[in-house]
């Protein structure tokens, strides 16, 4: 068994910026470097586009439910609480951390939460699958002999997590070195699967494309994140500890908020929803929650669900903080296994699993969700077929027309085939659902500007 030097908080919390490692610019306000990360993301175009990307249900109609933007904002809120509470607990255990950057981990986690879904293509996981399948099952399969094995592994496992790291760090045309020029700690905290596509998990998850591998290695070395792979093996690292808090915030929000949305859309009855949410608590606490709802004069069922949901999120946040603090040594040693949710106490853990089971059975397989997945898959499949072929054969007349639609920030005019293919994937994965549908209709002659 290989022995690794444990990670340490002083090294893990770094405000050094990618691409500006040697620069210390004069500051004209009191914002911390991590708050700058947060603000930079809030005002960015990729973050803004999340408002038009599906979370689970079709984009809001008359009943407003979550999209990727509202989800990311909620995850950032929970993530900030998780980080602040962990900082409070661990500084009591390690008083020497009080005079370091460690008290700011709530801001780091919050910024990383904002960025965690930036790389998701239109239509979520069905969009991911369509990009992968174009190369494994579609006309793109013939490209395998024309590209490197590392690049082929990346595109056949295309992953939103790796794409988020690329968006934040890659030097697109006309951009500065370092991409968004984020701090090392924020960047490391979004890499949920810190390994290359060649070392992808059974679910096909990985954290960075080959094009950004050197950047992640630079960050990991600086922060003392141990490399778990041996020389010659596919690259694999331990997680930065704050990844567990980002993951927990996401786990809490998507599971519990999907239950609330399902009630609003009448997929779940009020009785079903209340039962799912109240089972997180013992009988005495349930009765206190129900009595508080009565005492507050809450009679609307949607408002009752909101109150119960808030209680559940508060409980899960407390439980995840406890799990992190309890397992701090394993986390710093890179030996912690599973997510924080899997290490909370039995009652809320079983209740969370029950919510997951209901989500799979009644929500993710509901007709509105499946309709979006089917349509989204077809749209992305068609865009991949047309646009990647244009990248492969750029001199054809129709290819030039299609290439003319691509944003100038992407390296679509590169002499290198892999760069052109990746430019098209960048373009497609950055689309909103509505824009992807619009381009799909236009290139297929379904809609015309003059009609």
Where do the model's predicted regions map?
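Sequence-structural signature of the catalytic-core scaffold of metal-dependent phosphohydrolases
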Residues: 2-30, 42-53, 62, 73, ...
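Charged, amphipathic alpha-helical oligomerization/scaffolding segments
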Residues: 74, 244, 248-251, 312, ...
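Substrate-recognition/cap regions that form aromatic- and gly/pro-loop-enriched pockets
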Residues: 325-408
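C-terminal amphipathic alpha-helical interaction region
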Residues: 397-448
């Amino acid at each position: 068994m290989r022995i690794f030097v444990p990670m340490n908080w002083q090294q893990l919390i770094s405000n050094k910026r990618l691409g500006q490692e040697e620069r210390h610019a004069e500051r004209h306000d009191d914002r911390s470097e991590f708050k700058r990360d947060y603000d930079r993301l809030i005002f960015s175009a990729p973050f803004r586009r999340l408002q038009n990307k599906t979370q689970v249900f079709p984009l809001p109609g008359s009943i407003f439910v979550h999209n990727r933007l509202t989800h990311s904002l909620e995850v950032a809120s929970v993530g900030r609480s998780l980080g602040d509470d962990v900082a409070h607990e661990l500084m009591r255990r390690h008083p020497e951390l009080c005079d370091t950057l460690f008290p700011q981990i709530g801001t780091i986690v919050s910024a990383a939460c904002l960025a965690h879904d930036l790389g998701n293509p239109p239509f979520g996981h069905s969009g991911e699958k369509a990009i992968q399948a174009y190369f494994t099952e579609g006309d793109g399969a013939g490209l395998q002999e024309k590209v490197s094995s590392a690049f082929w592994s990346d595109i056949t496992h295309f992953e939103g997590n790796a794409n988020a790291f690329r968006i934040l760090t890659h030097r697109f045309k006309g951009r500065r070195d370092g991409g968004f020029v984020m701090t090392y700690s924020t960047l490391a905290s979004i890499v949920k699967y810190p390994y290359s596509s060649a070392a992808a998990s059974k679910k096909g998850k990985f954290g960075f494309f080959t094009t950004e591998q050197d950047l992640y290695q630079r960050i990991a070395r600086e922060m003392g994140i141990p490399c778990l792979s041996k020389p010659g093996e596919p690259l694999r690292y331990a997680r930065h500890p704050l990844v567990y808090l980002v993951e927990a915030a996401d786990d809490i929000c998507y599971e519990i908020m999907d239950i609330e949305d399902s009630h609003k859309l009448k997929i779940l009855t009020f009785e079903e929803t209340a039962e799912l949410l109240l089972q997180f608590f013992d009988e005495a606490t349930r009765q206190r929650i129900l009595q508080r709802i009565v005492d507050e004069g809450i009679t609307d069922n949607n408002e009752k669900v909101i109150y119960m949901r808030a209680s559940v999120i508060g409980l899960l946040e407390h439980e995840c903080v406890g799990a992190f603090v309890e397992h701090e040594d394993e986390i710093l040693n890179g030996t912690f296994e599973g997510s924080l949710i899997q290490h909370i106490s039995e009652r809320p853990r079983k209740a969370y699993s029950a919510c997951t089971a209901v989500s799979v059975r009644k929500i993710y397989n509901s007709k509105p969700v499946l309709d979006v997945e089917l349509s989204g898959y077809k749209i992305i499949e068609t865009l991949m077929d047309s646009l990647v072929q244009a990248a492969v054969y750029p001199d054809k007349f129709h290819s030039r027309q299609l290439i003319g639609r691509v944003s100038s920030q992407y390296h679509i005019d590169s002499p290198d085939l892999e760069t052109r293919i990746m430019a098209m994937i960048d373009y497609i994965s950055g689309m909103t659902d509505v824009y992807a549908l619009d381009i799909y209709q236009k290139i297929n002659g379904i809609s015309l500007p003059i009609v």
